[in-house]
Design a protein with these regions (language model features):
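Glycine-rich FAD pyrophosphate-binding loop
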Residues: 7-9, 20-47
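Central helical "cap/lid" subdomain
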Residues: 39, 121-176, 232-234
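Glycine-rich active-site loop/strand segments that organize a redox cofactor
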Residues: 34-78
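Conserved flavin/dinucleotide-binding core of flavoenzymes
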Residues: 17, 37, 54, 195-285
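Short beta-strand to alpha-helix junction loop
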Residues: 58-65, 73-91, 212-218
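Core beta-strand elements of the Rossmann-like FAD/NAD(P) dinucleotide-binding domain
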Residues: 2-4, 117-126
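A conserved short coil-to-beta-strand element within the FAD-binding core of flavoproteins
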Residues: 98-113
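Beta1/beta-strand and adjacent pyrophosphate-binding region of the FAD-binding site
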Residues: 1-14
Length: 285
């Protein structure tokens, strides 16, 4: 069994920022991440050795530092060398265990007992869940820890996202930002990642309607749209799709975190976001 004073579930931006702030304040913690990577929805995909951001394309409400470069999006920033580079920088000197999907949480006299699907056991005094709220709530529900159904946290929902990643023969000047049939093209112009890269965020309506369809069916619909664009119909070299079931919280909880039970907390983008949740949690951890 692995014992720590503080355990954070989720190595997305909230979990990493919180762990970094805890370390800076002299407190040690352990992050448990279910996947093989870091950053959650702060994600970069490589196509032909070139990178394209397919998660959170821009960051707001974040402090300037050497890894941030101003972009034309209002109050937005992108990360040089890819959004995932931010996660890598934040994770330096942090204790993180990957591929540890927790499925059991039990209150014990010493705090909280966690069991991963691979049967690894963890114990902590304080536990923070930073996964997208629907995933965190499902874990709590499975362990009879979820708030009553009348609690306002149940009213928070997420929108889905379907994203097309493509490389073009060339990026024309007219294509710096192109709105076309309610779909917005976020173009990686003058990026360190891929000078001719295109990231197309399909509308929320399209994403909701087609999310459960196969990639082939979705691409067929997307190509119908692109073929009507004078800028794109003959320029795409390679492309692939990415999906986010929990892309963005459509509303937020009116507090930076929620204490579900003594020493058991929810935090993240459905609350006040990475920095605000972390700052608010520090005094109670």
């Amino acid at each position: 069994m692995i014992k720590k004073d503080i355990i954070i579930i989720g190595a997305g931006l909230t979990g990493l920022v919180l762990a970094k702030k805890l370390k800076q304040s002299g407190k040690e913690c352990l992050i448990l991440e279910k996947s093989r990577g870091l950053g959650g929805r702060v994600a970069t995909r490589r196509i032909d050795e070139m990178g394209l951001d397919h998660g959170a394309a821009f960051l707001s409400q974040i402090s300037h530092d050497s890894e941030l470069k101003s972009f034309t999006a209002p109050q937005g920033f992108y990360i040089k060398k890819g959004m995932n580079n931010l996660a890598k920088e934040l994770s330096k000197d942090l204790e993180i265990l990957k591929e540890q999907k927790i499925h059991k949480i039990t209150k014990v006299s010493e705090g909280w007992l966690l069991v991963a699907e691979n049967e690894t056991q963890f114990q902590c005094q304080k536990l923070i869940l930073t996964a997208p709220l629907p995933q965190a709530m499902e874990l709590l529900k499975q362990n009879s820890l979820a708030p009553d159904s009348s609690h306002p946290v149940h009213g928070i929902h997420y929108s889905k996202a379907i994203i097309l990643l493509a490389t073009l023969n060339e990026l024309k000047p007219e294509m710096q930002s192109l709105d076309f049939e309610t779909h917005h093209f976020l173009l990686m112009k003058e990026r360190d990642l891929h000078p001719n890269g295109l990231v197309m965020h399909l509308s929320e309506h399209f994403s909701e309607e087609f999310f459960e369809q196969t990639d082939e069916e979705i691409l067929s619909e997307v190509m119908k749209i692109l073929k009507r664009s004078p800028f794109l119909k003959n320029d795409i070299q390679k492309f692939e799709l990415k999906k986010w079931r929990y892309s963005r919280a459509t509303s937020t909880y009116p507090a930076p975190y929620l204490e579900i039970s003594p020493d058991l907390y929810l935090a993240g983008d459905a609350f006040a976001g990475p920095s605000e949740s972390a700052e608010a949690l520090l005094p109670v951890l």
